[in-house]
């Protein structure tokens, strides 16, 4: 009888879990719809802006040479909340393959800090901003980019790279990275695969334009990466909660079958005892 009560208690607990995971799934779904709309609105502009900047970069008379053993400031766009599947883990794994001694990390979101902050003297963290969903705007990203550039200059680093999550579809998202400063010629060639037939004239010259647009490019790249990463985070959390709800339902059915069998055996035993007493 005590075991039956224990199974019943577990069933009640699982029912509560199902309600919680379903509620979190609905919240994640609402955020996903909002961020997807925001992503669609800005993605076209970002792509066209990258192409326009690429035309200037690829028109340089003297292409910048790749840096040898550069010291990098990695901007990690992790989440501030958990229960989002492999979203944060995948970015950590990607950075592990790229991180070199002397590199530094600026965190946007708090979840991945503990993985990299080992408490020793070689702590790579140089900054942290906890960006909430309601803070995600271009103006706010401009303020954050100023903080990042301060750390970049303070630690005398060579380049800035962003670690973010690239959106494929609601079920598939990939951790990715790209260099935002100095300009990566290979990235702009990917955005401008067709060779320009007519050479463009720039006023002022290309070098001056690049110096002027570099801060704006960083602001836009930061905002675009955050919007896409937030979209991926909400999709990943929605999938995680959906899987958790399904697993909880399966567990509830298992407990329900077990409960019914035990209850049936208990009733059968009581009937046998009653019949035995009458006879």
Swiss-Prot record:
Cellular compartment(s): Cell membrane
Major location (coarse): membrane
Lineage top rank: taxon: Bacteria
CDD domains (UniProt xref): F1-ATPase_gamma
Membrane topology label: Peripheral membrane protein
HAMAP family in alphabetical order: ATP_synth_gamma_bact
Designated name of the protein: ATP synthase gamma chain
Organism, as annotated: Mycoplasma pneumoniae (strain ATCC 29342 / M129 / Subtype 1)
Lineage of the organism: Bacteria, Bacillati, Mycoplasmatota, Mycoplasmoidales, Mycoplasmoidaceae
């Amino acid at each position: 009888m005590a075991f039956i009560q224990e199974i019943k208690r577990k069933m009640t607990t699982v029912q509560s879990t199902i309600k919680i995971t379903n509620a979190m799934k609905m919240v994640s779904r609402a955020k996903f719809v909002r961020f997807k709309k925001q992503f669609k609105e800005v993605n076209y502009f970002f792509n066209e802006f990258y192409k326009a900047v690429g035309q200037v970069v690829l028109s340089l008379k003297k292409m910048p040479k790749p840096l040898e053993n550069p010291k990098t400031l990695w901007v990690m766009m992790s989440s501030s909340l958990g229960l989002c599947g492999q979203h944060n883990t995948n970015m950590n794994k990607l950075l592990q393959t790229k991180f070199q001694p002397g590199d530094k990390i600026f965190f946007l979101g708090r979840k991945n800090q503990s993985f990299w902050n080992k408490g020793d003297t070689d702590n790579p963290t140089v900054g942290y901003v906890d960006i909430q969903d309601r803070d995600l705007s271009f103006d706010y990203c401009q303020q954050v980019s100023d903080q990042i550039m301060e750390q970049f200059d303070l630690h005398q680093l060579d380049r800035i790279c962003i670690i973010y999550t690239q959106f494929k579809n609601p079920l598939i998202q990939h951790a990715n990275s790209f260099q935002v400063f100095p300009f990566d010629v290979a990235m702009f060639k990917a955005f401008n695969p067709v060779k320009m037939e007519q050479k463009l004239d720039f006023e002022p010259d290309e070098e001056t334009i690049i110096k002027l647009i570099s801060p704006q490019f960083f602001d836009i790249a930061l905002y675009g990466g955050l919007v896409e990463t937030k979209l991926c985070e909400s999709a990943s959390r929605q999938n995680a909660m959906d899987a958790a709800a399904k697993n909880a339902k399966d567990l509830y059915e298992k407990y329900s079958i077990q409960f019914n069998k035990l209850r049936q055996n208990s009733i059968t035993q009581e009937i046998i005892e009653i019949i035995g007493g009458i006879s």
